[in-house]
Amino acid sequence: MRVLAAMGLALLLGACATGQAVRTSANTMIVQTSAAAVCGGQGALAASQRLTAIETIRAGYDRYVITGGEAQNNVRVSQLPGSYNTEGTYGRGSYQATTTYQPGPTIVSGSHDQGLAIVMFHEGEPGAQQAVGAREVLGPDWEEKVKKGVNFCF
């Protein structure tokens, strides 16, 4: 039981998301992220939003609008074979036995994937007033997050 708890804690602490961005024109980009199964779809979306803000700033823009998105759940759960244990007693001409089944551990694998299409704006450009501020998304320590890059661990 302690081993399973330790494995669960290790998975939770090692829950990471990675991402990449591809410029499709001077002011548009496609951002894709993949988050560990334990992060869920919300973790993948949060990673996409952070990556979008980071890449918007790196591209020299201030704000962005998400114009399209897609998500995919590739998480699978498998169970390893279990084991049977039979214990019995014999005495006075009778036999009594009890068989118990211990299920095998479950293995969670796969990822939650997220893709976003964005249009980026400079401050003051037409359409920028409706766009999300990249620095606002990242918070007060946005410079450090832009420097750190696209690999996140939650």
Label the predicted regions.
Residues 1-10:
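Sec-dependent signal peptide recognition
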Residues 12-15:
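C-terminal motif of bacterial Sec signal peptides marking the signal peptidase cleavage site
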Residues 17-154:
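Secreted/extracellular ectodomain signature
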